[in-house]
Amino acid sequence: MKLVELIKNLTIELQDGPLDREISGIAYDSRRVKPGDLFICISGLKSDGHLFAGQAIENGAVAVLAERQLDTGGKATLLTTPDTRSALALLAANYYGRPSKSIRVVAVTGTNGKTTTTDLIKAILEEAGKKTAIMGTLYAQVGEIQREMQHTTPEALEIESFMALCREEKADYIVMEVSSHALQLQRVAEIDFNVAVFTNLTQDHLDFHQNMDNYRAAKLQLFQMIKEEKQNYAIINIDDPWAEEIFQAATIPCRSYGIKKRSDYQAGELKIDLDGSSFRLHYGDNSLMINMKLIGLFSIYNALAAISFALQEGIDPGLIQSALARVEGVPGRFEKVDCGQDFAVIVDYAHTPDGLENILQTSRELGKKRLICVFGCGGDRDRSKRPLMGEIAAKYSDFCVVTSDNPRSEDPHAIIAEIIPGMDKVEKSRYAIIVDRREAIRHAIHLARTGDLVVIAGKGHENYQLVKDQVLEFDDRKVAAELLRGKVK
């Protein structure tokens, strides 16, 4: 593709060099530049791409897009534009031929529940015979082709590349998790979404957004960017405190789901135990009984979001029932670890105050004898949620083991010291501090007796632990299983 074609509709402030150069690819990481590429200088959270333009040119870049004038030594065409991050989204879409226009794209956003909801939507669509791609926290996949993802929502270049692959594979739908980071950083700015699904909004990522107003504003962008076309709409959790604001901000028709408030798709007759959940869905003059292996009130909310979408798409109710009955669950989301012990062990990704409260409240309602919770808080992330999570853990648990999560560059002891004041607010609070996560899990399992429930929260599906600059092999599920096998013997 010629450079002049690639930059169509892009605001160019300065041009130094020819526009008839042939562009063979786009890169924003100088280490990945190949001969013939356009290199886009992105000012990131940790580094500035403008500092690596010279390296990109040495690696073969024939054009550079920047926010300020740079010396290319006459070896590459230099273009400047006000915002290279939004430019990356535009040029990636141009380069790959805007694949989202030819596939129905469903965006799922919210603090908690995105991964499970996308998984359930995919299961229902596939039950209905629709070829469905998925993109999210765990991976991106279409058919048998799977790509690992570095972020919940990757950079625009990776998104458009994957969507182009989905177009080649003739996918009918792409269901993707859309994070607040992606919305604020313009990663999805050029995608033609058809449906937006809202799960909930609670405190998270304030290390990035600074406050809840900014976090909320980032989420709202999704409901304002979808084109007002006949087949486009939003699905909203009406029980969430922020629902009304989304209804008012949305530029497309909205449908609601819920349990507590009157909604278009409403669940009643709820039953939850360690074998699964069931409920009756009421919509219009119709009702539908849903039985599934997923556990918890939060799982019912996720299922409601997926069902509401499916019914809006005109999918047969019987197919919805059979799809949900078969779903085993998402790795690391309220996942049982069973080695024949006479007490229950659950691993969950809950790493926000609301997420932790959801799983502990559900665990408490399961009616087991004692609830033992192992948890910590991530380093280099929103510090204000640490005492909140401590208070929640102490409120619902009979005993807590406070430990490391992913401490990153922070001292694990310092993180725990910010958790404890929240726990001390709870009069009945009982806890132990064991910084080593493996030993913390060992202690919780050692304490467990017949009929108890141990919840290991925070890391879920993750198979690593981030300590300083190291990525250590660590999987809560494997560690728990190994320790349980030792105890059962």
Swiss-Prot record:
Q: What GO annotations for molecular function exist for this entry?
A: ATP binding; magnesium ion binding; UDP-N-acetylmuramoylalanyl-D-glutamate-2,6-diaminopimelate ligase activity
Please give the InterPro entries that the UniProt record associates with this protein: Mur-like_cat_sf, Mur_ligase_C, Mur_ligase_C_dom_sf, Mur_ligase_cen, Mur_ligase_N, MurE/MurF_N, UDP-N-AcMur-Glu-dNH2Pim_ligase
User: Where along the chain is UDP-N-acetyl-alpha-D-muramoyl-L-alanyl-D-glutamate bound?
Assistant: S30, T152, T153, S179, R187
Sites where N6-carboxylysine occurs are at K219
Top-level EC class as recorded in UniProt: ligase
**What is the annotated localization of this protein?**
Cytoplasm
In this chain, ATP is annotated as bound at G110, T111, N112, G113, K114, T115, T116
EC no.? 6.3.2.13
Listed cofactors: Mg(2+)
Which residues of this UniProt protein bind meso-2,6-diaminopimelate? R381, D405, N406, P407, R408, G458, E462
Instruction: List, alphabetically, the Pfam families matched.
Output: Mur_ligase (PF01225), Mur_ligase_C (PF02875), Mur_ligase_M (PF08245)
For this chain's UniProt record, which GO biological process terms are given?
cell division; cell wall organization; peptidoglycan biosynthetic process; regulation of cell shape
NCBIfam families, sorted = murE, PRK00139.1-2, PRK00139.1-4
Role description = Catalyzes the addition of meso-diaminopimelic acid to the nucleotide precursor UDP-N-acetylmuramoyl-L-alanyl-D-glutamate (UMAG) in the biosynthesis of bacterial cell-wall peptidoglycan.
To which protein family does this belong? Belongs to the MurCDEF family. MurE subfamily.
Protein known as: UDP-N-acetylmuramoyl-L-alanyl-D-glutamate--2,6-diaminopimelate ligase
Species per Swiss-Prot/TrEMBL record:
Syntrophomonas wolfei subsp. wolfei (strain DSM 2245B / Goettingen)
Lineage of the organism: Bacteria, Bacillati, Bacillota, Clostridia, Eubacteriales
